[in-house]
Swiss-Prot record:
Induction entry: Expressed at low levels in exponential and stationary phase in rich medium (at protein level).
Misc. comment: This gene overlaps yhgP on the same strand in another reading frame.
Designated name of the protein: Protein YhgO
UniProt superkingdom: Bacteria
Organism for this UniProt entry: Escherichia coli (strain K12)
Amino acid sequence: MIYRELNRALAIL
């Protein structure tokens, strides 16, 4: 898992 990937998921929310 990458921090940017998690951040993108939060951005979708």
